[in-house]
């Protein structure tokens, strides 16, 4: 779905934009009870709940919520990342109960039988990791590789991320492997999903290594390539380097938010660079040539034409930043500033203040009068 047609996440959950995390969780719990497919059997409930779950996954995560508040749905689409940050997999109702109420629906079975129950869970995509990275303008010009240290969840090596031990399974004693129970008599019968195995027909024991979580935590250094021409605020993605998916689901992605430090000489606007140079008043009148630096290390000579005005821009083609999308480079603009000396400085240099003042008055008489008010 295009970002222009997607509903506002706050509107989906029915909360204001300044809602607290507790208000967001409360709204989500209310919608779970109304629309979760395990509760609501209407065909439209599944798509509705996917929308609700996606909104909650973003607004309940402070980093993702910050990006969403700044850029809207575009924060997780298009430039840089090229991936959508969303969770359309529907977590089982017991997983939600565990998250909000610290309640395991299987605990009743465990207390009654004295052994852990571990049904097959529905796979869920792993959470994304968002990391800010600061680089210099020179690094943005040339491109660079930066090491990113992250602590991420990885699939359990013992169970492969499923959370259960397939070698230790048995037919459900309640339903006999059918996945449903039948109550009533020959005249009237009610069929319902087996409460012991959740409709699977088989009971699996939790993995001993991860105790059913399906993942473990590891610290990892990931080298991320920053392309030449990257802009401040650009989003880059390393696919599959987020947190592990739940119960065999695909992993999330690692998102890099690039911050380019301000430069002491150059100002950047898009793919163009701006540099300020000072010239004297006679140079402005007569014209001159100045040498200016560039980010590729060379210096270029720029001609200042006679009659140059304060703040005038002189374009040096092809000496700006590399274009991130496309070939070539932007332009370098030299912004001219005229250093007008005070009369006291001229008097010291020439040794006669009155003579300097007379010369300036004579010059003022012959020069054309400028328009005082500048029209934009």
UniProtKB/Swiss-Prot annotation:
A zinc finger (CR-type) spans 143-219. One of its GO terms (biological process) is chaperone cofactor-dependent protein refolding. CDD domains: DnaJ, DnaJ_C. InterPro entries: DnaJ, DnaJ_C, DnaJ_domain, DnaJ_domain_CS, HSP40/DnaJ_pept-bd, HSP_DnaJ_Cys-rich_dom, HSP_DnaJ_Cys-rich_dom_sf, J_dom_sf. Binds 2 Zn(2+) ions per monomer. CXXCXGXG motif repeats lie at residues 156-163, 172-179, 194-201, 207-214. It is found in: Cytoplasm. Its cofactor is Zn(2+). Pfam families: DnaJ, DnaJ_C, DnaJ_CXXCXGXG. Residues 8-72 form the J domain. Participates actively in the response to hyperosmotic and heat shock by preventing the aggregation of stress-denatured proteins and by disaggregating proteins, also in an autonomous, DnaK-independent fashion. Unfolded proteins bind initially to DnaJ; upon interaction with the DnaJ-bound protein, DnaK hydrolyzes its bound ATP, resulting in the formation of a stable complex. GrpE releases ADP from DnaK; ATP binding to DnaK triggers the release of the substrate protein, thus completing the reaction cycle. Belongs to the DnaJ family. This is Chaperone protein DnaJ 2. It comes from Aquifex aeolicus (strain VF5).
């Amino acid at each position: 779905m295009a970002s222009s047609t997607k509903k506002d996440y706050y509107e989906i959950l029915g909360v204001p934009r300044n809602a607290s995390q507790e208000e967001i969780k409360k709204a989500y719990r209310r919608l779970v009870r109304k629309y979760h497919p395990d509760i609501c059997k209407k065909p439209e409930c599944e798509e509705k709940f996917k929308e609700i779950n996606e909104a909650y996954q973003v607004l309940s995560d402070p980093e993702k919520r910050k990006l969403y508040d700044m850029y809207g749905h575009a924060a997780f689409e298009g430039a840089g990342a090229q991936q959508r940050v969303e969770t359309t997999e529907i977590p089982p109702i017991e997983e939600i109960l565990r998250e909000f109420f610290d309640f395991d629906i299987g605990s009743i079975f465990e207390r009654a039988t004295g052994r852990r129950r571990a049904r097959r869970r529905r796979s869920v995509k792993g959470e994304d990791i968002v990391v800010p990275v600061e680089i210099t303008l020179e690094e943005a010009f040339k491109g660079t590789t930066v090491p990113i240290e992250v602590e991420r969840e990885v699939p359990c090596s013992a169970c492969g991320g499923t959370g259960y031990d397939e070698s230790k399974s048995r037919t459900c004693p309640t339903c006999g492997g059918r996945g449903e129970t039948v109550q009533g008599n020959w005249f009237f019968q009610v069929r319902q999903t087996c409460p012991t195995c959740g409709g699977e027909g088989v009971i699996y024991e939790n993995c001993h290594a991860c105790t059913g979580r399906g993942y473990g935590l590891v610290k990892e250094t990931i080298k991320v390539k920053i392309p030449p021409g990257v802009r401040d605020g650009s989003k880059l993605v390393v696919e599959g380097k987020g947190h592990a998916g739940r119960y065999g689901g695909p992993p999330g992605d690692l998102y890099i938010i690039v911050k380019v430090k301000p430069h002491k000489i150059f100002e950047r606007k898009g793919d163009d660079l701006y540099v300020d140079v000072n010239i004297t008043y006679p140079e402005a009148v007569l014209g001159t040539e100045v040498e200016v630096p560039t980010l590729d290390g060379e210096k270029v000579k720029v001609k200042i034409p006679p009659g140059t005005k304060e703040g005038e821009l002189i374009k040096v083609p092809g000496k700006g930043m590399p274009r991130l999308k496309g070939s070539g480079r932007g332009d370098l603009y030299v912004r001219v500033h005229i250093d007008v000396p005070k009369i006291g400085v001229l008097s010291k240099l020439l040794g006669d203040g009155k003579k300097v003042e007379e010369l300036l008055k004579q010059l003022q008489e012959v020069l054309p009068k400028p328009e005082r008010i500048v029209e934009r």
